[in-house]
Regions:
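Long, charge-patterned amphipathic interaction tracts in eukaryotic proteins
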Residues: 3, 39, 43-173
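Short, charged, amphipathic alpha-helical segments
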Residues: 28-37
Length: 173
């Protein structure tokens, strides 16, 4: 990890304060620009908000654990687990799996964990809906295997598993 100077951490703190004050006065553009600049520096130096809290215990952010979330799915379990892993990676959280089950939990600050869970629910539903829509269009021009229940399941599983690398590429940019 890069050695981060106090100058960089202080700059990020100033950007966070600027974002908060701009939000309070209703300047959405300025708040968004400050948040984007702060996020860019956090990503560049591989930092999280916990790294900026310093030694003062009252400034420390507390970690929390989400409720158990099932990643069991008729189209295969891998895509949901990978979706959660990507969302946690880009939202400063960790995902833990319960051994011998199809359950996982999110560990992170309350705000970050809530963001990950909300994104997971939204993207899970959206990817499922899109997979059905794409299959309908794909199956119209096909015969045989791709019109069977197994062909549909294979298509949807492949589509869902392919969504995750695409999401990762979008989050990297």
């Amino acid at each position: 990890m890069k050695e981060v100077s106090e100058k960089i951490t202080e700059r990020i703190r100033k950007l966070i304060r600027l974002k908060e004050s701009a939000t309070q006065i209703g300047s959405e553009g300025e708040a968004h620009a400050a948040a984007a600049a702060g996020h860019r520096l956090l990503m560049e130096y591989n930092l999280s908000l916990l790294d900026l809290a310093g030694e003062n215990p009252q400034n420390r952010l507390t970690a929390c654990e989400s409720d158990r979330i099932s990643y069991k799915d008729a189209a295969g379990n891998i895509w949901k687990r990978d979706l959660m892993r990507v969302l946690c990676e880009y939202n400063y959280c960790k995902m833990l799996l319960y051994a011998g089950t199809t359950h996982m939990v999110v560990i992170g600050t309350e705000e970050n964990a809530a963001t990950v869970i909300a994104l997971f629910d939204y993207l899970r539903k959206t990817f499922r809906r899109l997979s059905e829509e794409k299959y309908s269009g794909y199956a119209q021009g096909r015969r045989g295997y791709w019109r069977t229940a197994k062909g549909k399941k294979d298509y949807i599983r492949s589509y869902l598993e392919g969504c995750i690398p695409g999401l990762r590429m979008q989050l990297e940019n």
